[in-house]
Amino acid sequence: MQAASAFATCLLASVGGNSSAVAFPNQANYSTLVAPYNFDLLTTPSAIVWPQDTQQVAAAVKCAVDSDIKVQPKSGGHNYGNYGSTTGELSVNLDNLQHFSMDETSWTARLGPGNRLGRVTELMYNNGGRHVPHGTTFTVGLGGHATVGGAGAASRMHGLLLDYVEEVEVVLANSSIVRASKSHNEDLFFAVRGAASSVGIVTDFSIRTEPVPVSSVTYSYIWEGTDPAARAEVFLTWQSLLAGGSLPQHMAYDLVATANSMILGGAYFGSQEDFEAFNLSSHFKVAPDVAHIKTYTNFFDFSAAASAQTKAAGIASPSHFYAKSLVFNQQTLIPDDAAEEVFKYLATTKNGTDLYAVTFAALGGAVRDVSASETAFYHRDASYFMFSFGRTSGDLTDTTVQFLDGLSEVLTSGQPDAYYGQYVGNVDPRQSTDKALTGYYGKNLHRLQQIKSAVDPNDVFHNQQSIPPLS
């Protein structure tokens, strides 16, 4: 540990004198402990602390405030801007807060933010055969995922993970510990479900659960080739089927464009017979070159396979990369001519990557059953998310940044003046704060600033795209 300072002494005391639970920049292994997710945005927090419980989180926050140091929490550490380890700020690593219990009367789970999604899936499955909608990557932390949205395979059927959060325990900027729900500290509860890192640190979640599906069918259909017209045809059919309303709500339905293929994949929560009766591939004019269908009766096995597939795709691990997101609704669907321009762009523009993927992830369904003003997550009318991702073997170049920035421009060229939201779970730290906040929070931004002003007027919980208090 570095030479004693008031901040260092206080931080060490906050964790009961456990020197292994704090780290400072002069330590030889500090960059390893920071563990950046995006290698192109290396950061140096003023210190890292690993508290054991809520009281230690609160004590660490007080140390930072007393030394005029800002704070960000970190659970799984998958933030695309490394915001959980912001330079010059205290990184509160929540890895030790992994408690879990299940009330088998209400089927409500109590969980700590340090739990990873893989552990959440396994514990819920083994304690009553339960689950909640969430993303497929098992290494993602609950603390961030449950407070930005939490979309995943079951979201069209059940909604977002944050929609299942019933109550939270939060450490505020004044180091007080409060609980929030729909009936208590309602404004804070609104903000936590979509923008928690700007208002406090969630140390405990109460999450209602659903029974696991009896049968889960995974499917993938692959069209090989690079012809822009053929690729646009697959995309437009995918978009039309989603927009037309005939797609079963209990179906996850994603389309991924890579350099050489179009991959339609997802899950159907029901029997394989019912899935085959829907005959998804028959809706496309050209039959896919490859088809894979598999049925799982063990929901954890299904979830583990989905996580392994995401990992194998190479888009969910620490690396050099750049990524962007866009939200499309029924009013901003991509028109035919713009779709062909998108795939011409992909075919002809230098990308500078060793891997890129453009994912169109279907939403709608139960996500729309919650109003845009009920939680900080604004994009309830979304038909689908677009996630673009470019990975490089070394330092990111302007070529890759310009490739993905240009792709977003082409994707929105059909209605360039329309509002296109963005997903705060996939931050783009290269854009301006104003553009980012408008994209993430839409018309909820002003209310969020009011709440920020009330609970954190001095902007203790801060990163480069956090919500500022009203000036």
From Swiss-Prot:
SUPFAM superfamilies: FAD-binding/transporter-associated domain-like (SSF56176). Disruption phenotype: Leads to the accumulation of sorbicillinol and impairs the production of oxosorbicillinol. Gene3D superfamilies: 3.30.465.10, 3.40.462.20. Pfam families: BBE, FAD_binding_4. It comes from the Eukaryota. Its cofactor is FAD. Residues 1-23 form the signal peptide. This is FAD-linked oxidoreductase sorD. It comes from Penicillium rubens (strain ATCC 28089 / DSM 1075 / NRRL 1951 / Wisconsin 54-1255). The gene is sorD.
